[in-house]
């Protein structure tokens, strides 16, 4: 059978149903191209237009599709290997970025793809044919044998990228690459669930990443991103909920070599559900509980790590531990909490299913006899053909997990249970070559497969857990049967009486997050995961250093001198991989410290707790965990002085440090200050019984001073009590007696520092008998060379390997901390913050949230009643006033615009009585508003009316220039008019050089009076020469380009990831945002490439850099005069070289009426505000370093009012009462003010400013507010309008406050923060702070009007509206010209009421 993708049909005579058989035949061969789902135009596929960044029209789905926990009715297909539930932004905003994206994304191969010039095609359709749905169902049931066993899709959506190529820069003489990719995505859904299939046929991936367009000549390639993202932006960029499958080129290469379905190249995922779905869940072949593996996972799965590890040349895999750090055991397919990169590993080549499984996979797997056995080591070369039998008396535990995981985690052997024989093993299993080898099912819960009934155990006994003393956990309702437990058997089915018994289901929260919970017949126990140790309730990483903090108090009789001290500090540091323990106690009085020198048990406790373990032994922490009581009684000889030491451990603090308090009471012999104590190496025997450890021994020590050497001794009796778990089988207990060997004991008191120090090196093992000395493995005596944060793995003889402990990464000889918060390897859930610690991390809930019982999930603290929502407020009716909630039961009332009063009572404002209309207009008052209409014989918007009369002079016989001149002169007679009056020569023709009389701008015109593009000059400069243009010349290289070329030559043409290369734009100017190599460490630069202080950011938040060089002029250019706006309220926004006009209908955006108000070529307009009294718009220009204004009258032209003393003017605010303007200058770090005509200029502030940006004014109350986005200490400040009473208003929980506005009606100060992604408001005094919206993209400026906020956004390059009441994003406007928008302001038809 063959598949003809071009024709879109099967080659006759084979029917489509045979495709199912072909795909699911019993083989492990790679997916072939003809095994893709059928596609082609004959199947109803639509074709995406050719291009580099194309997007399909919305595909309206017949039935909404579930993605994560939401439903969507539309899908969009993009050129760049991606599907979304909403239209895509420009590709530059996502195609070169890592996950998460800012929009919902389903990405089978996200890269910069280009189908221009017929390089491949992209097809898509919705399909309901039975053949396609049946094939999709088979795939899903294969990968999800439990939850997907009854999945019957009703609809499918298919997208196929066929022979598509990567975007390539056009180079002279270079032929396009012949590397083309083919892949397919299928979304299958029913009314409850959605599954995704990603299919990569053999040889279908010929390129594995693409170069960013901004990389210029740097040979940088970004690997394709594969995965899913819900698209919600949280406080930190990398905390949005997402699932990522790839992160390196090698992992992309292996997409068609590995699988989680059993066929290399085929992948399945559960991506949406009506039930709770924490994150995308990958498929698991043979995921039935009866065939799950029999040992706990040592760490979380990681697709990316497994794909990366599976190289084309070797099966060798080195575990870097980044995937191991903080996850508890989970099943394949379980999605972890939080927003982190989900780590799951799969391989298709070896993954058996039980022959008696009810959900046996239809996909083939090698027989268990073909499975290799691996020796436990740091790294192993895996040979699938190797067979290795276990020693006699051992059972080989075959790990029925995904074999790609075997690349990371080696096989494990455990002793066979006493008395176990072949007759008592699970029936139906294949005998592995007549060896004493058996595979056992896992009975742990499968979180990703909820509500699955569990079959009873039939003649089944579980082996010991791979780690001594651990038994695998079970599904709900099943208990582990130990050989010493009492059970009843009937018909070979075990039954139990579980009445009044604590179970893991209700008590799992008592276990450490690094432990699993196991149910036994009498209760539950906690057991630490592999690579951790402890008592299950407290677990710490193996090999990692540990710290102890505590207090020491004492009441001693030193000789005949009483000495007392209280709560002095104790700190201990333990290098656990070689058994060293260091203890320091500060501020103990000198006589007591000197006398306690021989009392080594004070610090010796930590040596026993974290001693090096010899095989078959356990140190103290493995027994006690972090809660115990250590009682010591020391009796000195010959004086019989007796002292008692009590050390109480109180658990682990949030940084995983052991907390311990010590109390010392009794009598100790006096030791003179000039004596030191020497203690020889010694052994102690510790006896274990139930929850008590005891030890008694005698010890001698020497007191030395010069030639004096005195030998004394004491007897030590120790008793350590703790709470052991009594439910586990007793045969799992530690040996009754263990020997602690202490070497290199050391005690010293430093009188200068006031610190008493102890140091010991410890090993614990079985009781030794005298025998001939043998070579000791360095792992047991601490002589290895592993890093202090690495585990030492003993090998044969004196061989060993080193492996970094969880929370660290490296080669084992050198390890560095893993920042789980930055890399995403953490379990902090939504509404929580991850805080990195050395070797670990902790989760903290955000404000307003608290931890749930699992200590990872943060749940909302129930808010107090909101009077504004429940209707219990006392404000005026909704149409007259609005209720403002201030937290708790506090609220205030504010009259709506057009009404006046207390807010509790509001009355209509008669605007007509205030003469708001033009003198030639009629005013009509309405409740809450008014309107103006020009009288007959006049035209205009009512606020300005002009006469309809024609100029008195006859127009007959006038040339165009003369006519326009006469008309302009007539209009100029009206007060306030700034229209240009054309200049004509003696013959009535246009003078080639035209200049505006009031503004000073000059330009050339043609014979029809039309401006010649590009000839306009600003005031004060040399007028243009109105003649033919000069011949073009080649542009010389700029400073940026020369610097870039020099560095690239220095780096040998290919810089490393950590080497800086300047980024230049097409004209050679420095790009305002510069970053260090591939890192997220970025900063802003000026036009000369100099870093702007205070702009350097940490990874996660890019600084908001504003360009200082205007883009080139695009011809033809429009005239620099005002196109009059429509009547009513509208928004004005700055967009680089133009000011845009966006009308409002109420509070809704009238997007179809939006247009350009004023074109200002050669400018970069940033700040903008409006003077409501004279109807003039003001703006700052960072390219021209000026502040200008223009009237909103027809034909009015810009007027520059401040031309000097500016470097980077950004924010601008107008006080229409006092006729004053205020602005920020981030180049000079100043805040200034001046009259609206530029006079009376004054610097208000020039200190304690780093990056001042937004500024706003409350003219009625006389307050000024501004933001400073200094990356080290962002803040919002306020002062009076005269610069008095300056103070910080907000400096907590803000990141990059770009936008600031004061609402004169609600009296609220509000700001938009691009760092925290929040829109927040507060009262003018800084109280009553509340969040309006916490999922913004990248806001720049914000303004308030009526019941909405409007902000410009740099991610969407548009204007976004946000409801004040609900906080929801209600609408957006994206201008046709896609570039960054800066300032925004609202233009009212009247001024807000009030007086100075």
UniProtKB/Swiss-Prot annotation:
Gene label: Nid2
Q: Which segments show compositional bias classed as Polar residues?
A: 346-355, 379-388
Residues annotated as glycosylated are: 379, 468, 674, 719
Q: What is this protein called?
A: Nidogen-2
Where does the record place Pro residues bias?
1020-1033
Please give the positions of the paired cysteines in each disulfide bond. 504-517, 511-526, 528-539, 779-792, 786-802, 804-815, 821-834, 828-843, 845-858, 868-883, 875-893, 895-906, 912-923, 917-932, 961-984, 995-1002, 1004-1026, 1040-1064, 1075-1082, 1084-1105
Q: Which Pfam families match?
A: EGF_CA, G2F, Ldl_recept_b, NIDO, Thyroglobulin_1
Question: What modifications does the entry list under PTM / processing?
Answer: Highly N- and O-glycosylated.
Give start-end of the signal peptide. 1-30
